[in-house]
């Protein structure tokens, strides 16, 4: 990453952390890693912030493996080693539970399979974070995710809901 881009990323990260009081002294933060650009950028930003932020905190990266065979985690492992962040993989059978071959399971048919998968992933991640001694979990949600969540909530749940900047673990 270019130096100017990195400074801008760290500046935005610090601003959000300060504005919403997301990090306290001694926090052990689990970072949910999907392998996508958003979660990897969050990990990179928090690892950079950790070097100079006045409140000391530690990070642990966690990926919830849904059980797909072709999910290569090698690049994530390498990045975590470079950033000196412990990395844990939570093996699950979420894909098998939601899908039977090409057919969506009865559990997922009652609602959106995406919503059920998200809830199951979040539960697995939160459980792992607690087991690893983390007191907070960082998700790489951004404004597009807030808007999407609000619309999906209205469509599938009949209510207007969007997640807050922080919730308790």
Feature-to-residue mapping (PLM):
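ATP-dependent adenylation/nucleotidyltransferase module used to activate substrates
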Residues: 1-165
């Amino acid at each position: 990453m270019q130096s100017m881009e990195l400074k801008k990323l760290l500046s935005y990260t610090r601003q959000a952390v300060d504005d919403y009081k997301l990090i306290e002294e001694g926090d052990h933060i689990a970072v949910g890693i999907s392998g996508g650009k958003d979660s990897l950028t969050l990990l990179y930003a928090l690892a950079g912030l950790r070097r100079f932020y006045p409140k000391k905190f530690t990070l642990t990266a966690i990926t919830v493996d849904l059980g797909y065979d072709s999910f290569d985690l090698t690049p994530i492992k390498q990045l975590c080693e470079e950033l000196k962040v412990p990395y844990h993989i939570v093996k699950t059978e979420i894909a098998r539970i939601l899908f039977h071959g090409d057919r969506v399971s009865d559990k997922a048919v009652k609602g959106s399979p995406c919503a059920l998968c998200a809830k199951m992933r979040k539960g697995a991640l939160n459980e792992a974070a607690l087991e690893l001694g983390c007191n907070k979990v960082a998700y790489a949600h951004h404004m597009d995710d807030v808007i999407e969540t609000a619309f999906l909530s209205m469509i599938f749940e009949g209510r207007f809901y969007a997640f807050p900047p922080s919730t308790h673990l």
